[in-house]
A protein has these predicted regions:
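Short, charge-rich amphipathic interface segments used for partner binding and complex assembly
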Residues: 29-63, 67-68
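N-terminal acidic leader/helix
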Residues: 1-34
Length: 71
């Protein structure tokens, strides 16, 4: 399924960007960077919600976004 591959690629790109920010440590992020991290997390949550009832592992989102990026 080409559309599923595209969604997985989008998720990978967002996750990579969010992981890069997370690696700095939340306490070291400035307001702009923290805003970016929030936006990435919200984007991933929106995609998760759209895939409710499906296997999130298929698109690389089988994790708790809030715990990974915000808590």
């Amino acid at each position: 399924m080409e559309s599923l591959h595209l969604i997985r690629e989008i998720v990978e790109n967002i996750t990579e960007a969010a992981d890069e920010l997370r690696s700095k440590g939340r306490e070291n992020l400035d307001h702009m960077e923290f805003g970016e991290l929030l936006a990435y997390a919200e984007s991933l949550c929106i995609i998760q919600d759209a895939f409710t009832g499906r296997d999130l592992a298929e698109i690389g989102l089988a994790f708790d976004v809030d715990k990974r990026y915000l808590i």
